Amino acid sequence: MKRMIAALALVLTLALPGLAAAEGTGMYLAPKFLMSIQDTGRMERSSGLAGSGVDDYSQFTLGGALALGYDFWPQQMLPLRAEIEFALRGNSEHSWSDGGTNVSDVKGTWNNSTLFANLFWDFHNDTPFTPYIGAGLGLAFNYTGYDFTTTNGSKFSVDDRFTNFAWNVGVGASYSFNENLAIDASYRFVGLGYNEVSAYHNGQKYEVGNDPYNNEFMLGLRFAF
């Protein structure tokens, strides 16, 4: 993640002078800083995890996104923007030690990245501030993993990766410094599909399913070119 952010900063530093001098074509590049509250959503457990305490969990994580977009306002005077966005987020982790019937400790690790096609409606006015609403459809690339410790001390793990349909809806506002540069702040809700992993240990089935989602706050820039 640190390498990605450093590389992105270098690219933007090199590209900024050219972007600032470019004429408005409607195209823009938008790096975004993500503050994400990742939630496991509803947790479904098999009987092997009875009493383990495994339940809904949420955690604040950081991430980053990069979007390439087109603003229909400069050329067509339509208050629409469309963009393709890829976002990465940090891991969410939690441990339960409630001493269940079969397991004494469970550690969960979750992660998601997304690829969205987003559409925004801008409410243009006579000020540099432009409120907007938006929604997007795309794919979520989810990771789910669990480490189990049984009541007799043995350990085993299960994990998997999922590619799910994902969606988002949100609101935000931008402030334009000039025709080529704007700062953007927004909130969105992100649905990430359904994940389910299972394993057998000593003849007992251990299965966990969940519907993850994120509440995300984003701060970004838009470089028009």
Where are these regions (language model features)?
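Outer-membrane beta-barrel "beta-signal"
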Residues: 28, 34, 212-225
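Residue-level signature of outer-membrane beta-barrel architecture
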Residues: 35, 70-72, 121-123, 141, ...
